[in-house]
Amino acid sequence: MEFYLSSDCASLARYVSKVVYLEDNDIAHIYDGELHIHCSKIGSEDFLFRTVQKLELELSKIKKGPYDNFMQKEIYEQCETTKNVMRGRVDAFTNRVVLGGLENWLTELRRAKRIIMIASKSSFHSCLAARPIFEELMEVPVNVELALDFVDRNCCIFRNDVCIFVSRSGETTDTINALNYCIKKEAVTIGVVNCSGSSISRFTHCGVHTNTGPEKGIATTKSYTSQYIALVMIALWMSEDLVSKIERRKEIIQALTIVPSQIKEVLELEPLIIELCDKKLKQHDTFLLLGRGYQFASALEGASKMKEISYVHSESILTDELGHRVLAVASDNPPIIAFATKDAFSPKIASCIDQIIERKGNPIIICNKGHKIWEQDKQKGNVVTLEVPQTVDCLQGILNVIPLQLISYWLAIKKDIGVDLPRDSAMSAPDI
């Protein structure tokens, strides 16, 4: 009998059909075709039993198919993965969200006095994107914490806190350390992960599986949008007993149902983005991204992707922080990408963009279809617009981040960079 060892079950899909998950302090001893599991803790039983589980991964899902690389494949899979995370959970006819993985903890979750979302990297950005809707629907304080910093500070955690841990793999070391800390403080914990057998999914009290499927590319693309939707669904579910929020919840639930088709519309921008990267962007090594409100998280995620995949310096800035220092840089004509889709902050964002144009900047504006405010500037060649469908404000970031994924991808391709295996990555390399 052969045994394979891996930190990621997806890498084993082509070799095995059954897996055994080791837990903390387990020691696996393989000898002469046999597996024995022991515990390293003093006083524990010498031999342990761990359940053999079926590995439910389709080999076709971890192949590139007709795409050139995994990142491109996974960007295009977002039409389907956003459906998967909502399938069986969002009911547009009754305007309800059903999350079976949380039902047993309903009472404890709805009496939360504070919600803390803890994550790292792109998962941290998805938490930032969802924070405003949690605050609006739940009417309780909501904190978003970087997992490493959270543990370093020994944050105050109380028994009536609800801590949400978000991770693509479910094995992020810093996030697991934060989870262990919160468990010791007796807080209620929720896991939002893609891998059902992962450490975070097993150690949290309850959770939501994002059903994203394997993500072989190093860059987080489809997991980001699936996490975003999963967090919005949790906010909708936890606020179901608030009568004052009924109409707002209906609006969001109806908008959720058409997000997959709207993503398909956004992906139609790819030819324009390829041309934009080829003619205007590939010669630059500094980018500025502007956003406010829900779109600041989009700016953070977009800047992160450009650094990680395209190897360019990119900085995300709140639009009202566009002071003289940033405007002085803008006059040197680095590409500026501004999120100007319709929401409560649209007038102020428009004012900032006008200041950039006055200083001879040439911003790239992500706006809604039919937005005519910069039509004259567009005809003069002062701006470039990337038009995306309009949706409810708390979901607009799902659509807005996809042009940035495509820009990062095509900038890397134009520079002959391997997008599936960026240099100096701290994550495990995909099986390419």
Curated annotation (Swiss-Prot):
Keywords: Repeat. GO terms for biological process: fructose 6-phosphate metabolic process; protein N-linked glycosylation; UDP-N-acetylglucosamine metabolic process. Residues 105-244, 277-422 form the SIS domain. The keyword GTP-binding does not apply. Transmembrane segments: none annotated. InterPro entries: GlmS/AgaS_SIS, GlmS/FrlB_SIS, SIS_dom, SIS_dom_sf. The keyword Repeat applies. SUPFAM superfamilies: SIS domain. Coiled coil: none annotated. One of its GO terms (molecular function) is carbohydrate derivative binding. Pfam families: SIS. This is Uncharacterized protein EC1118_1M3_2531g.
